Protein backbone atom coordinates (compact mmCIF):
# COMPACT_ATOMS: atom_id res chain seq x y z
CA UNK A 1 0.00 0.00 0.00
CA UNK A 2 1.40 3.37 -1.04
CA UNK A 3 2.03 5.77 1.79
CA UNK A 4 -0.13 8.88 1.71
CA UNK A 5 2.01 11.92 0.95
CA UNK A 6 -0.57 14.65 0.53
CA UNK A 7 -2.60 16.76 2.94
CA UNK A 8 -5.25 19.46 2.75
CA UNK A 9 -5.14 23.01 4.07
CA UNK A 10 -6.58 26.42 3.18
CA UNK A 11 -5.03 28.80 0.65
CA UNK A 12 -5.81 32.02 2.51
CA UNK A 13 -7.88 33.44 5.38
CA UNK A 14 -11.66 33.11 5.29
CA UNK A 15 -14.61 34.12 7.46
CA UNK A 16 -17.96 32.75 8.51
CA UNK A 17 -20.76 34.28 10.59
CA UNK A 18 -23.47 32.51 12.58
CA UNK A 19 -26.20 34.20 14.62
CA UNK A 20 -28.32 32.54 17.30
CA UNK A 21 -30.69 34.29 19.75
CA UNK A 22 -28.97 37.64 19.16
CA UNK A 23 -25.52 36.14 19.93
CA UNK A 24 -23.17 36.68 16.99
CA UNK A 25 -20.38 34.21 16.24
CA UNK A 26 -17.65 35.39 13.87
CA UNK A 27 -15.30 32.64 12.67
CA UNK A 28 -11.97 33.41 11.01
CA UNK A 29 -9.82 30.64 9.52
CA UNK A 30 -6.09 31.26 9.01
CA UNK A 31 -3.47 29.14 7.22
CA UNK A 32 -0.63 28.55 9.74
CA UNK A 33 2.55 26.46 9.97
CA UNK A 34 3.86 27.12 13.50
CA UNK A 35 2.61 27.73 17.04
CA UNK A 36 4.26 31.19 16.81
CA UNK A 37 2.01 32.05 13.85
CA UNK A 38 -1.00 30.82 15.83
CA UNK A 39 -0.07 33.10 18.76
CA UNK A 40 0.35 36.06 16.39
CA UNK A 41 -3.11 35.63 14.86
CA UNK A 42 -4.69 35.11 18.29
CA UNK A 43 -3.20 38.39 19.54
CA UNK A 44 -4.43 40.10 16.38
CA UNK A 45 -7.98 38.81 16.94
CA UNK A 46 -7.97 39.70 20.64
CA UNK A 47 -7.02 43.29 19.74
CA UNK A 48 -9.48 43.57 16.86
CA UNK A 49 -12.40 42.05 18.80
CA UNK A 50 -11.45 43.50 22.20
CA UNK A 51 -15.13 44.06 23.06
CA UNK A 52 -16.19 40.45 22.40
CA UNK A 53 -17.34 38.21 25.25
CA UNK A 54 -15.24 35.21 24.15
CA UNK A 55 -12.42 34.53 21.65
CA UNK A 56 -12.28 30.74 21.30
CA UNK A 57 -10.10 28.75 18.94
CA UNK A 58 -8.68 25.46 17.72
CA UNK A 59 -5.71 24.66 15.53
CA UNK A 60 -4.11 21.68 13.80
CA UNK A 61 -0.50 21.63 12.57
CA UNK A 62 1.65 19.33 10.46
CA UNK A 63 0.95 16.76 7.73
CA UNK A 64 0.56 14.00 10.37
CA UNK A 65 -2.12 16.12 12.11
CA UNK A 66 -0.77 15.25 15.57
CA UNK A 67 -0.13 18.80 16.85
CA UNK A 68 -3.47 20.35 17.80
CA UNK A 69 -5.17 22.31 20.54
CA UNK A 70 -8.64 23.58 21.43
CA UNK A 71 -9.47 26.46 23.80
CA UNK A 72 -12.87 27.41 25.25
CA UNK A 73 -11.77 30.85 26.53
CA UNK A 74 -14.23 30.94 29.41
CA UNK A 75 -17.13 29.16 27.72
CA UNK A 76 -18.35 25.98 29.50
CA UNK A 77 -15.78 23.19 29.04
CA UNK A 78 -16.02 21.43 25.68
CA UNK A 79 -18.61 23.78 24.17
CA UNK A 80 -16.36 25.92 21.96
CA UNK A 81 -12.82 24.76 21.18
CA UNK A 82 -13.82 21.10 20.80
CA UNK A 83 -16.60 21.68 18.23
CA UNK A 84 -14.26 24.00 16.27
CA UNK A 85 -11.56 21.30 16.30
CA UNK A 86 -14.22 18.77 15.29
CA UNK A 87 -14.84 20.72 12.08
CA UNK A 88 -11.10 20.78 11.30
CA UNK A 89 -11.02 16.99 11.87
CA UNK A 90 -14.12 16.17 9.83
CA UNK A 91 -12.85 18.23 6.88
CA UNK A 92 -9.44 16.50 7.20
CA UNK A 93 -7.56 19.82 7.29
CA UNK A 94 -4.23 20.76 8.83
CA UNK A 95 -1.97 23.82 9.10
CA UNK A 96 -5.09 25.75 10.06
CA UNK A 97 -6.25 27.95 12.94
CA UNK A 98 -9.93 28.78 13.40
CA UNK A 99 -10.83 31.56 15.81
CA UNK A 100 -14.50 32.07 16.73
CA UNK A 101 -15.40 35.35 18.38
CA UNK A 102 -18.68 35.56 20.31
CA UNK A 103 -20.68 38.69 20.95
CA UNK A 104 -23.26 37.85 23.63
CA UNK A 105 -26.83 38.77 22.73
CA UNK A 106 -28.29 38.68 26.24
CA UNK A 107 -29.94 35.26 25.94
CA UNK A 108 -28.10 32.17 27.20
CA UNK A 109 -27.84 29.39 24.64
CA UNK A 110 -27.16 26.48 26.98
CA UNK A 111 -24.47 23.86 26.49
CA UNK A 112 -25.96 22.19 23.41
CA UNK A 113 -26.78 25.56 21.84
CA UNK A 114 -23.18 26.72 22.25
CA UNK A 115 -21.80 23.53 20.71
CA UNK A 116 -24.09 23.92 17.68
CA UNK A 117 -23.19 27.61 17.30
CA UNK A 118 -19.40 27.21 17.48
CA UNK A 119 -19.57 24.21 15.16
CA UNK A 120 -21.75 26.08 12.64
CA UNK A 121 -19.54 29.20 12.66
CA UNK A 122 -16.38 27.12 12.11
CA UNK A 123 -18.10 25.13 9.34
CA UNK A 124 -19.09 28.40 7.62
CA UNK A 125 -15.48 29.68 7.66
CA UNK A 126 -14.28 26.37 6.15
CA UNK A 127 -17.06 26.44 3.53
CA UNK A 128 -15.92 29.93 2.48
CA UNK A 129 -12.25 28.89 2.27
CA UNK A 130 -10.30 27.66 -0.74
CA UNK A 131 -9.12 24.14 0.13
CA UNK A 132 -5.81 23.14 -1.45
CA UNK A 133 -3.87 19.88 -1.59
CA UNK A 134 -0.17 19.93 -0.73
CA UNK A 135 2.46 17.23 -0.99
CA UNK A 136 4.72 16.03 1.80
CA UNK A 137 8.20 16.55 0.41
CA UNK A 138 11.59 15.14 1.42
CA UNK A 139 15.14 16.20 0.63
CA UNK A 140 18.14 14.13 -0.41
CA UNK A 141 21.78 15.15 -0.94
CA UNK A 142 23.91 13.29 -3.46
CA UNK A 143 27.70 13.56 -3.85
CA UNK A 144 29.35 12.68 -7.16
CA UNK A 145 32.37 13.45 -9.32
CA UNK A 146 32.06 16.15 -11.97
CA UNK A 147 32.48 13.87 -15.04
CA UNK A 148 29.19 12.18 -14.05
CA UNK A 149 27.20 15.44 -13.94
CA UNK A 150 25.28 14.57 -17.13
CA UNK A 151 24.11 11.25 -15.66
CA UNK A 152 22.82 13.02 -12.54
CA UNK A 153 21.15 15.80 -14.56
CA UNK A 154 19.42 13.21 -16.78
CA UNK A 155 17.82 11.68 -13.67
CA UNK A 156 16.87 15.15 -12.40
CA UNK A 157 15.22 15.94 -15.74
CA UNK A 158 13.28 12.66 -15.78
CA UNK A 159 12.22 12.47 -12.11
CA UNK A 160 11.64 16.25 -11.82
CA UNK A 161 12.78 16.97 -8.24
CA UNK A 162 13.39 20.60 -7.24
CA UNK A 163 17.08 21.52 -6.96
CA UNK A 164 17.45 23.05 -3.49
CA UNK A 165 21.20 23.73 -3.64
CA UNK A 166 24.27 22.62 -5.54
CA UNK A 167 28.03 23.08 -5.28
CA UNK A 168 30.86 22.01 -7.57
CA UNK A 169 34.19 21.69 -5.77
CA UNK A 170 36.41 18.60 -5.68
CA UNK A 171 33.23 16.60 -5.19
CA UNK A 172 29.92 17.83 -6.56
CA UNK A 173 27.04 18.09 -4.12
CA UNK A 174 23.39 18.45 -5.02
CA UNK A 175 20.39 18.65 -2.68
CA UNK A 176 17.06 17.72 -4.23
CA UNK A 177 13.47 17.93 -2.98
CA UNK A 178 10.69 15.63 -4.18
CA UNK A 179 7.38 14.31 -2.88
CA UNK A 180 7.74 11.53 -0.34
CA UNK A 181 6.28 8.73 -2.48
CA UNK A 182 8.77 9.47 -5.30
CA UNK A 183 11.85 9.55 -3.05
CA UNK A 184 12.75 5.80 -3.02
CA UNK A 185 12.97 5.65 -6.82
CA UNK A 186 14.98 8.88 -6.99
CA UNK A 187 17.48 7.63 -4.39
CA UNK A 188 17.76 4.26 -6.14
CA UNK A 189 18.50 5.86 -9.51
CA UNK A 190 20.99 8.38 -8.08
CA UNK A 191 22.92 5.73 -6.17
CA UNK A 192 23.41 3.70 -9.37
CA UNK A 193 25.40 6.52 -11.00
CA UNK A 194 29.14 5.79 -10.94
CA UNK A 195 30.95 7.61 -8.04
CA UNK A 196 27.62 8.85 -6.64
CA UNK A 197 26.60 8.28 -3.06
CA UNK A 198 23.71 9.49 -0.95
CA UNK A 199 24.67 11.62 2.05
CA UNK A 200 22.56 10.97 5.11
CA UNK A 201 22.42 13.69 7.75
Regions found by a protein language model. Give the residues of each.
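Short amphipathic alpha-helices in soluble, non-transmembrane regions
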Residues: 152-158, 184-194
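C-terminal regulatory domains involved in ligand/effector binding and gene-expression control
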Residues: 1-78, 199-201
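Structural motif
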Residues: 28, 56-57, 95-98, 139-141, ...
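Active-site beta-strand/loop microenvironment that shapes enzyme catalytic pockets
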Residues: 80-128
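Conserved short beta-strand edge segments in small beta-sheet-based binding/regulatory domains
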Residues: 162-168, 192-201
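Short amphipathic alpha-helix segments
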Residues: 142-160
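Terminal, non-globular segments
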Residues: 176, 182-185
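Short glycine-/aliphatic-rich beta-strand segments at the starts of folded cytosolic domains
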Residues: 131-146, 174-176
Amino acid sequence: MQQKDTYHTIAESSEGIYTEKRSKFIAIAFPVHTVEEVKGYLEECQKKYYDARHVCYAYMLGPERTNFRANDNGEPSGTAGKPILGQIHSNELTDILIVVVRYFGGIKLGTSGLIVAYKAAAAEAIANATIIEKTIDEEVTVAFEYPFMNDIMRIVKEEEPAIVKQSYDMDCLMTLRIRKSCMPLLQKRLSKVETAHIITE
